[in-house]
């Protein structure tokens, strides 16, 4: 799944470490999400969207693999 997490993080002048602490996850989790190597749980995806004050689909873009 593609995402705009890095864009929103930069928009708010947050480091990966800052965002990880605010969301209660590891920096490695943020890195993996930004690189598209890890899809967050639905709970975490909603938490991220709420943190930035946007809709979940503004950050995460679903791509049909078929």
Curated annotation (Swiss-Prot):
<keyword id="KW-0804">Transcription</keyword>
<keyword id="KW-0238">DNA-binding</keyword>
<keyword id="KW-0805">Transcription regulation</keyword>
<feature type="DNA-binding region" description="H-T-H motif">
    <location>
        <begin position="16"/>
        <end position="35"/>
    </location>
</feature>
<dbReference type="GO" id="GO:0003677">
    <property type="term" value="F:DNA binding"/>
</dbReference>
<dbReference type="Pfam" id="PF01381">
    <property type="entry name" value="HTH_3"/>
</dbReference>
<protein>
    <recommendedName>
        <fullName>Uncharacterized HTH-type transcriptional regulator MJ0272</fullName>
    </recommendedName>
</protein>
<dbReference type="InterPro" id="IPR001387">
    <property type="entry name" value="Cro/C1-type_HTH"/>
</dbReference>
<dbReference type="InterPro" id="IPR010982">
    <property type="entry name" value="Lambda_DNA-bd_dom_sf"/>
</dbReference>
<feature type="domain" description="HTH cro/C1-type">
    <location>
        <begin position="5"/>
        <end position="59"/>
    </location>
</feature>
